[in-house]
Amino acid sequence: MITDLILHNHPRMKTITLNDNHIAHLNAKNTTKLEYLNLSNNNLLPTNDIDQLISSKHLWHVLVNGINNDPLAQMQYWTAVRNIIDDTNEVTIDLSGLNLTTQPPGLQNFTSINLDNNQFTHFDATNYDRLVKLSLNSNALESINFPQGRNVSITHISMNNNALRNIDIDRLSSVTYFSAAHNQLEFVQLESCEWLQYLNLSHNQLTDIVAGNKNELLLLDLSHNKLTSLHNDLFPNLNTLLINNNLLSEIKIFYSNFCNVQTLNAANNQLKYINLDFLTYLPSIKSLRLDNNKITHIDTNNTSDIGTLFPIIKQSKT
């Protein structure tokens, strides 16, 4: 059982994991080469000991969640931990599962922040210019302000399982990964997010989405919403399109705008008529689901090699 810890300098020591102990005192004044430090689930109290870590200019990843199992102590301890940051470092902080309701100070100094499984109802990241990755899954979020300005560098946002009705990421042109599944979103606009590669908005209340042309998008998940139609946007590199469990009545809009799609799931919609000629515009298609629709007629007049499509067709109600 470790209760007191003195970290002496070692020329090759870069990673230390000390999670799940009973450490109450830390002396780390000589850890000048340390890059990764895990202190999760210990009994550390908010003292000045942690300030000694500022001498480690290489430190980039600190885990301190579960400190002392006391929200107030965690907040105070966090105030000390934030002094570790050096402006040139890329630093990750994990504060998940602490039942926090108020934003800790100093978060704007970090490049990667994990705040999953807390109790935030609002989060303000307006001045988080250094932020690259933000995870706020399983909170109680009703609103959020994203970073603003010319130097915004955020690429990864995950906000699944919250209570969001509206979000505005249209000015976050740097985002490549955005996931806000299991919220209450009714409308999303992200025309300016030109570098998006992964977009998951499933399990919301979406009736419309304005995405614009997305040359980099690889996966688009709009399943389990209330969409009746989709805009005729261009997704030339899209690999996976999930639009199942909506209210779509037609599928004609896909055609050449989805020429590289390999997986298309349009099950559980309101489709009544299918012209399989649209498959000629999807030369890469490998998986097509049209089951549980209201299809009464399938037009195969202009579709070659219909035999290869039979396993796909018979999944639907004909």
Swiss-Prot record:
SUPFAM superfamilies: L domain-like. The keyword Transport does not apply. Keywords: Leucine-rich repeat, Repeat. It comes from the Bacteria. It holds the Pfam family LRR_1. Gene3D superfamilies: Ribonuclease Inhibitor. LRR repeats lie at residues 109-129, 130-151, 153-173, 174-194, 195-216, 217-237, 238-258, 260-280, 284-305. Missing about 125 C-terminal residues compared to orthologs. PANTHER family: AGAP008170-PA (PTHR45712), INSULIN-LIKE GROWTH FACTOR-BINDING PROTEIN COMPLEX ACID LABILE SUBUNIT (PTHR45712:SF22). This is Leucine-rich repeat domain-containing protein YddK. It comes from Escherichia coli (strain K12). The lineage of its organism: Bacteria, Pseudomonadati, Pseudomonadota, Gammaproteobacteria, Enterobacterales.
